[in-house]
Amino acid sequence: MTLHTTVGADAAPPLTKAYSGEPALVAIGRDAIAVRAGTTFAGHRFKAETPVAIEGALIAGADYGVTVRGGVARAWRAAGIPDGADVLGGFHYAPGGNATGRAGGDDVPAINPCSLWDVNFRPACKDPRGMALVQDGSHRFWCDIYLTGKDCRINGTSRFGVTIADGNDCPADPATCEPFRRFDYAAAVATLAAHGKGLLSLSEFPLAAFGVTERSATKGDPKVTGLDAPRTSRFGIMQAAGNMLIWGHDGDPDTPRASMFGGSWLDGGDAGSRYAYVAYRWPENSCGDFGARGRSDHLQLGGRRDSDDGR
């Protein structure tokens, strides 16, 4: 269950921006980012939009941290959670671009502009890697770009190129560190809660998956997390529909009921962003096409923390 707490203004780290409602970083095309004009971090003020130097070639499916040292901003591949007094923020370099309409994305690697975060504007969970900001008007939340992986206890819940957690490849129970016997609703809730995340609600899933090619599915068991361009959403959520049925809930704030969203490869022309089993009657079921995807509240220091009905 995602925690719903308020962060005091006095907890703000040493970052100020011209506008608190957007990250300090901005994507420039597919392969470059910059620090926004008017940003002050670690005692340095960026008066103009300033390019970030990227160490080495960008790797598709990798997460990057951005540090500021001596007034110079640099991006580096983040093997772990980007942390430290000099870390300004980070981003994800996706294996394909976001949807621009309602026919999915493309297969050209790109920085996902929705994945940009900074220390004042980020997911509320501890690990911001592999997440994208989903927003509809004033409502904002962060969604895992990738389906939950079997080895999420080690790799985090959103990682490119890993075995998908499902009824045939169960993740470890956080309480015992032994694999679950079933990947049912309770197991999915527990798996994500251990990372400070929750499952998508009935109102959140169609927002996160909007932009996929509707009424379509991939041709077989995807097995690993990755790119399925026709079913990438406008926010860069990969394999967003028509790959795995994902566990979610109906949105009840007190007693949320298990639900399933998106459709799997078995659902063909029925799959899509509006595909849902609401208040699913068999939450103890576990199958090879039942997966999960994490979500987190939006944390905005100096502003607000957005939360919905995520459980």
Please name every model-derived segment.
Residues 179-183, 190, 256-311:
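Disulfide-stabilized, aromatic/cysteine-rich ligand-recognition loop
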Residues 231, 246-253:
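Short beta->alpha transition motifs characteristic of CBS
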